[in-house]
Design a protein with these regions (language model features):
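Conserved catalytic core of sirtuin-type NAD+-dependent deacylases
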Residues: 1-269
Length: 269
């Protein structure tokens, strides 16, 4: 770790040590050390294969059976099914146990925060989850493994098998993730915004802060008087406005970042 990076970590520790209400905004960078590639980084899914972005576009998915077939094969072979939380995820669990984490807003769809031990009621999956499947016609929701097994057994483009008055719905099935062209949950976004407006610190981890509306939480936090701490491998558009910037692998840096939390005001009360 360079001296500059070490200084950023120490500044971030001091900021967190004074905070009572911390909101975390997490991105794909926190899961890369669990074996899940990010999307826009140097080795990102869309960086290496720009055509893959079409699989995450709602209009293409709904109108093109071949896109759906490819998407189901990607889901079937996703490394996320075998991935396990890393030390970065566990550090955020410690932040919650410390009593300062008010909300964890994640752009990730892998569910690793909950697997690590974060309270699901304190996690907002603003881009949805890959662990559920939803019917685009009737809205029926089911756990993903059941549908994934249908694909493994040979179905190329599975459709909804929910029955209504003896008839199958037959609607298009899709992972319960937010695709390009699909609206975010108004409730989830409102929860995130309200929490940020009440926070002392917005801790951004593993996110390029280039995707809106999630990235819009940063100016919202700054306008509300909160400090922003950014921990990310690459530069972000908000680095100059942050109280501290931490570089390096999050599985190494986040445990160091939360270590001194017990020395803060919450431990004295």
């Amino acid at each position: 770790m360079t001296a500059a990076a070490d200084g950023g970590l120490e500044r971030a520790r001091r900021v967190l040590a004074l905070a009572r209400r911390v909101v975390v905004l997490a991105g794909a960078g926190i899961s890369t050390d669990s074996g899940i590639p990010d999307f826009r980084g140097p080795q990102g899914v869309w960086t290496k294969d720009p055509g893959a972005e079409r699989l995450a576009t709602l209009d293409a998915y709904m109108t093109d059976p071949e896109v759906r077939r490819r998407a189901w094969q990607v889901r079937l072979h996703s490394p996320a099914w075998e991935a396990r939380p890393n030390a970065g995820h566990r550090a955020l669990v410690e932040l919650e146990r410390d009593g300062r984490l008010t909300l964890l807003v994640t752009q990730n769809i892998d569910g690793l925060h909950q697997l690590a031990g974060n309270d699901p009621h304190r996690v907002v999956e603003i881009h949805g989850t890959m662990r559920d499947i939803v019917c685009m016609r009737c809205g029926a929701r089911t756990a993903a493994p059941a549908v994934i097994e249908r694909v493994r057994a040979g179905e190329k483009d599975p459709h909804c098998e929910t029955t209504f008055e003896g008839a199958n719905c037959g609607g298009i099935l899709k992972s319960a993730t937010i695709s390009f062209g699909q609206q975010l949950s108004v409730i989830d976004l409102a929860r995130a915004q309200l929490a940020v407006e009440d926070a002392d610190v917005l801790l951004c981890v593993g996110t390029s802060l280039g995707v809106y509306p999630a990235a819009g939480l940063v100016p919202l936090a700054l306008a509300a008087g909160a400090k922003v701490v950014i921990a990310n491998a690459e530069a972000t558009p908000f680095d100059d406005e942050a109280a501290a910037v931490v570089r390096g692998a999050l599985s190494e840096q986040l445990p160091r970042l939360v270590e001194p939390i017990a020395e803060g005001p919450a431990a004295e009360s």
